[in-house]
Amino acid sequence: SDLWVQKMKTYFNRIDFDKDGAITRMDFESMAERFAKESEMKAEHAKVLMDSLTGVWDNFLTAVAGGKGIDETTFINSMKEMVKNPEAKSVVEGPLPLFFRAVDTNEDNNISRDEYGIFFGMLGLDKTMAPASFDAIDTNNDGLLSLEEFVIAGSDFFMNDGDSTNKVFWGPLV
């Protein structure tokens, strides 16, 4: 659907950190560096964050890239093929706990509104956009995102061809 393509373009736009038209390992490194700086995290946490975010590239996207950067068309076409595969859900969900760990800066196994705002800042978005996305994902309305809520919302973002509240998982659609 057009909505699904728009969601994939949104994800690509958020992850193409240097806006050079391709997703590369450098985008994930830059994201980790900005996040560590914005959240003023300790050096050991910054290392875990770097490992988590570069792990998304190393473990999941490098196969699509074939050792190079991934342009938007290649990314969208790869995702189209992936979501048709019944086993794709585990591949799509694989990086989500890594992102969760990156966003859960105080390591309490929940993401707070403030942490989600930092996440939006890390993606280069206005932090004031975060509450609407946070509320859409916080299905039990307890003011915290659990790993389960985060993974379900992230998986739905990629796998659901229709409209859902999780379409704003990575912020407003581009």
Curated annotation (Swiss-Prot):
- Positions bound to Ca(2+) 3: 138, 140, 142, 149
Q: What is the recorded function of this protein according to its Swiss-Prot or TrEMBL entry?
A: Like parvalbumins, SCPs seem to be more abundant in fast contracting muscles, but no functional relationship can be established from this distribution.
Q: Where does Ca(2+) 2 bind?
A: 104, 106, 108, 110, 115
Which miscellaneous remark does the UniProt record hold?
A: The sarcoplasmic calcium-binding proteins are abundant in the muscle of arthropods, mollusks, annelids, and protochordates. This protein has three functional calcium-binding sites; potential site 2 has lost affinity for calcium.
The alphabetized UniProt keywords are: Acetylation, Calcium, Metal-binding, Muscle protein, Repeat
Name its species: Hediste diversicolor (Sandworm)
Positions bearing N-acetylserine: 1
GO MF annotations in UniProt: calcium ion binding
InterPro entries tied to this protein: EF-hand-dom_pair, EF_Hand_1_Ca_BS, EF_hand_dom, EH_dom
Q: Taxonomically, which superkingdom?
A: Eukaryota
Residue span(s) of domain EF-hand: 3-38, 55-90, 91-126, 127-160
Q: What is this protein called?
A: Sarcoplasmic calcium-binding protein
Q: Where does Ca(2+) 1 bind?
A: 16, 18, 20, 27
Which Gene3D superfamilies does this chain map to?
EF-hand
Which taxonomic lineage is given here?
A: Eukaryota, Metazoa, Spiralia, Lophotrochozoa, Annelida
Q: Note the Pfam families from the entry.
A: EF-hand_5 (PF13202)
